[in-house]
Amino acid sequence: LVDTEEKRTELLQNLLTKEIFSLDTETTGTDPITAELVGMSFSYAENQAFYVPVPADRTEAQKIVNEFRPAFEKEGALKVGQNIKYDMLVLGNYGTEVRGPLFDTMVAHYVLQPELRHNMDYLAEIYLHYQTIHIEELIGPKGKGQKNMRDLSPEAIYKYACEDADVTLKLKNILEQELKTNDAEKLFYEIEMPLVPVLAYMERNGVRVDTEALKQTSEHFTARMNQIEEEVHQLAGTDFNIASPKQVGEVLFDKLRIVEKAKKTKTGQYVTSEEVLESLRGKHEIVGKILEHRGLKKLLGTYIDALPLLINKETGKIHTSFNQTVTATGRLSSSNPNLQNIPIRNEDGKEIRKAFIPDDGCEFFSADYSQIELRIMAHLSGDANMIEAFKEGDDIHAATAAKVYKISIDKVTREQRSKAKTANFGIIYGISVFGLAERMNVDRKEAKELIDGYFETYPQIKEYMDKSIDLARGQGYIETIFGRKRYLPDINSRNSVVRGYAERNAINAPIQGSAADIIKAAMVRIYQRFQSENIKSKMILQVHDELNFSVLPEEKEKVQKIVIEEMENAYHMQVPLRADCGWGSNWLEAH
């Protein structure tokens, strides 16, 4: 327990001589942008750790953080943390940067075992066979009565905090070796670790939201829902609660009898899931209206009415959290709000994007990869026909249609192009004849002809798909172009449904995972150039294959040049990477 100025000075002097130390912050909450420091712990040798309490008084707290600033900002020292992005953001609240190389034990484990849990209590158990003190033992279970770390004395906290720093350092020593053994060093040190400060910077930047626009959309949607409800009641000839699946089932299947045999759950209730209703859309006009009502309700609840509540009082912005250790494929995910799930297919979903706006006096800039997954497929399979189409700069869907239907590219109809597009995207996800027929609303015969024609056109893609499955069968995992592994234990399952799912992953995970690797590499390069060229504009959001920026008018040309250059040169393949971009006064316009 380091609770005097003398002890602090001694600890700092020690830290400054070390090449490696772990750090951990104890705070008043889980949201790093608003959290206040309660204490900091450090460890530079196994079984030895130090806890520095930080008082509630802001001036005093700032003084203590400043004392340790030389250690945090020492370029040469490796900083080790468990979810270190959180600690970086908290220290950032006190104007302190964590500089130099990083090692995040949570991300290291994610790179090794993407499907497992990565929290420290779990890692300590499996790697150190050690039971950590759980936070609940200090502050009580989640809920109303839960205490705050601030309410506890330093004496009550220091063992827990020191343990965190010590365990983190021990885990690093083990995981470092594991990364070596598993050939995951390049991915970890060149992509995932340099990405950590980039994500911290994006979360710190936050994004502005047009609350006025959301309010209007909310009123507009609510009015529409009320109208739809009236229409539905009229069509049903009775008033009922649209939000109740039970009542919807009774109206559709008992009263209106829109199908002979309706699916029921174990409890004898009718199934009225999205899927079921979608398949019944053509049977009665009431179905489409119920679906529309549900869609609006979800948008209102998840985004339109929820976004204003997520605005940070101090900054006036929303600071989404980017999660680097969640998806099995290597993509980023985000929470509070989840940006990856904003529906863009339909007009209503687009209303949400309209509410995301740039900083005052700035413009919104959006850049996204054009057909990156198909390009990766062309590269991985080495298919000469597809590579040629991309090199010629052809519209890939039209080129596919021309080849499959054996006509010249200028004769391709819109419908043929649309079918080829469905095939292009469906087939790389390992879609079946049945699945394709359903998605395109055609019979199975036509779907089968399309798939056969597709593989005739791109024979090496079929080879690649078969090879991927064989490889996964043999070694139990697949890899992306940067060597990210995805384990597929079900690939040899006796159950054909389970096995089929693993087989589709064997085909798609290398493609989706490589796309994730590439955009991460691009983000790191853009961030580094923004820093070295002193760009004041900001990268604010990442969604799938798209990056979004808030840009100062005088930096427009410079930013566009940097972003497109770095996105297109993030990785060199047999086909060029292409990025499209747009400008606007909000996300929707720019996209």
Where are the regions that the model predicts?
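A short alpha->loop->secondary-structure connector
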Residues: 92-102, 116-121, 383-387
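Conserved catalytic core of nucleic-acid polymerases
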Residues: 147-150, 197, 204, 259, ...
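Short beta-strand
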Residues: 241-243, 538-543
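Conserved "right-hand" nucleotidyltransferase catalytic core of DNA-directed polymerases
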Residues: 1-56, 70-73, 82-84, 98, ...
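Metal-dependent catalytic core segments for phosphate chemistry
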Residues: 20, 27-60, 121, 366, ...
